[in-house]
Structure formats: C-alpha cells, structure tokens
Amino acid sequence: MASARDLHAHRQRLLADEQGTLHKVARVRIALCYPSPYHVGMSSLGYQTIYREIHLHPGASAERVFLPDDVEAYRRTRTPLFTFESEAAVSGFPMLAFSVF
C-alpha cells in the first residue's frame, strides 16, 4: 500500500532519469497538465513543445502535471495532485493548461 511519501519518491525517481528539465521562476505560473501517466505524456512531442514554448516566454513558466500511475493511492492518502518540478499542489496555480493530443 503506497503512502504519500512513496508517491513523492516515485516522482523523484522519474526526475532523476530526465535530461533537459526546465526550471524557471516567472511571474505567470502555469500547471501544464497531461491526462495520462508520466510515460505517455513525456512521449508526446506536442506536450514537450508546449512546455518548451511556455518557458521561452520571458514572463511565464510551466510545471508539469500527469495523471497519477496509482490514482487510488492519491485518493487513499489524500495527496493533492502536484507538479513534477516543485511538488506544488495544482490547486495553487493561477492557470491550468491541458494538452490532449
């Protein structure tokens, strides 16, 4: 049975294998959501392009959000959906963007 700590550790393992992760502080923060698990979302060239384009804008930054691999664990532990870059709760973002292609 996964705990909230396990959910965050899973995110950290995924990030450890990444290359080219973008980190930026900007006035406009956007949670860029993909309605599928991490591996599907990161295979989407459209999603990656939108992520990069947002970061090219001087006043905006994007943090990635994916459908959890284990949705039931999030519900059971009452873990809010959070971003990959900062583990910030999606509910705290002023803007949500969705990539569905």
Question: How does the language model describe each region?
Answer:
Residues M1-F101:
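A short, structured N-terminal alpha-helical element that caps or precedes a catalytic domain
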